[in-house]
Design a protein with these regions (language model features):
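Helix-to-loop junction immediately C-terminal to a conserved catalytic motif
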Residues: 50
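Short coil-to-helix segment of the ABC ATPase nucleotide-binding domain corresponding to the Q-loop/switch region
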Residues: 101-109
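Conserved ABC ATPase signature
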Residues: 142-146, 150
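A short, proline-enriched helix->beta-strand linker immediately N-terminal to the Walker B motif
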Residues: 161-165
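Catalytic Walker B motif of ABC-type/P-loop ATPase nucleotide-binding domains
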Residues: 167-170
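ABC ATPase "signature
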Residues: 226-227
């Protein structure tokens, strides 16, 4: 059984349809990279998966449970939405850390609010996550004392603290200087080695090619092409994919 199944996802903003019947599946432990030009629907897809936006049509199924059905508006109460979001962790382009909290406090905040674990257990797991992203020596620092790359790694640890089924990244390196990009991509590569299921919207073609199990190219609200990195990057079938990759290679 697939960990994620998306069927017929359609989303519009006014007269502009930004997702036009999106269909795909993801297996546990797979990494899916989503590439494409701005305005293709990539970020909107992530926002729909995370219940930050609601599609008009389609279904989202996680581990066999339908967590979203465009035809059923009865399950959009705040409590239901919060529960749906637990399936997905989302790391944004901007780090969105709470500036008044330390690294440890940022990572432990959501689990403490959930109230399902003891304080000791939350602290222990947070320290393990902070170590996992290579920031043990910064655990008591505040965001203003960290580099952009370090802040993004804290954001990754914070997302992992909720134990999501699927970890989503929306252009995780786009706000970083080139020299800081590598440290964030290294963390994501480490997560892959631990069989973390991930969806990564990225403009880093080398990363998408080397780390992904699947690559999705989106254009104008549709999946123009999807397959293994070898198939998409070396033998693209769509003319739009070919044009996008040719342009990306020139940059």
């Amino acid at each position: 059984m697939s960990i994620l199944e998306v069927k017929g996802l359609t989303k519009s903003f006014g007269d502009n349809t930004v997702l036009k019947g999106i269909d795909f599946t993801l297996e546990k432990g797979e990494v899916l990279s989503i590439i494409g030009s701005s305005g293709g629907g990539k970020t909107t897809l992530l926002r729909c998966l995370n219940s930050l936006e609601f599609a008009e049509k389609g279904t989202i199924t996680v581990n066999g449970d339908v967590i979203f059905d465009g035809a059923d508006k009865s399950r959009r109460k705040e409590k239901d939405i919060r529960l749906k979001r637990l399936h997905f962790g989302l790391v944004f382009q901007q780090f969105n850390l709470f500036p008044q909290y330390t690294v440890t406090e940022n990572v432990t905040l959501a689990p403490r609010l959930m109230g399902n674990q003891s304080k000791e257990e939350i602290e222990r797991e947070a320290q393990a996550l902070i170590e996992r992203v290579g920031l043990s020596d910064k655990a008591e620092n505040y965001p203003c004392e960290l580099s952009g790359g370090q802040q993004q790694r804290v954001a990754i640890a914070r997302a992992l603290a909720m134990k999501p089924d699927i970890l989503c990244f929306d252009e995780p390196t786009s706000a970083l200087d080139p020299e800081l990009t590598g440290e964030v991509l290294k963390v994501i590569r480490g997560l892959k080695s631990e069989d973390t299921t991930m969806i990564v919207v990225t403009h880093e073609m080398g990363f998408a090619q080397s780390v992904s199990d699947k690559v999705m190219f989106m254009a104008d609200g549709v999946i123009e092409e999807m397959g293994t990195p070898e198939a998409v990057f070396e033998k693209p079938q769509s003319e739009k994919t070919k044009a996008f990759l040719a342009n990306a290679n020139e940059k």
